[in-house]
């Protein structure tokens, strides 16, 4: 008998360890020799790992160490430089078990680099999942594939983190709740004419104290992939009780989806780095790598086979 939504297990437990194991199996099955780290880029907002065959991986940087950007003799700079030349799998394995947020972020970036050749839509489909890919200039972007395929006007949606997704979701669901660690006034605009009104409209802002209740009662929950870096992913998934769908979004989500979809995530929306030369050039000259990735690399939406079942087209 098919399991009901309430019976579907959403645990998020050791998902990175299982993903690394699956990556190892894919490399062995396809007789591919894994690369070593050829370059690391550190930015206050992101970390990048480049492999020796120009594989590119990116992850959110949630650690704070201003000295890295001004003192090339800083012990941490020297320590991180020591990772260059090591196997990507070693950086990933050591980092995901580390309590050091910088190492954990670099581990996810290394896993992202290792994942790239298995993120193509044809490769994902061969492994039994639905996949859709597009570029920023494609018409499909205007149709918001995630929204049109998965979210209905009757859904109560909870978004963790105030992201551009909030703008796209406005008007496409019954209610949109956004939970962010920053105070709600960070995102508010006061509009003054003959009256006083406040924006954004149609978005209900919440503090993190309200997280369990908001995520526990929503129909669709969207979790940032940056939660993999600070190790809050499992906690967020465990807050979900009622949701029909749980989605993962963001740059850190550029990982093979297999284990996430087995552990209770229903869909992932992220990016595949299929123009490495543009990516490598930009990482040195453009601090807004999120926009670079959004505009120059391939977007993807990966889903469980029945994730969009029952959604009106």
Explain the meaning of each model-derived region.
Residues 2-172, 300-313:
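Electropositive, gly/pro-rich neighborhoods at or near active sites that engage anionic ligands
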Residues 172-217:
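Conserved nucleotide-cofactor-binding alpha/beta core module
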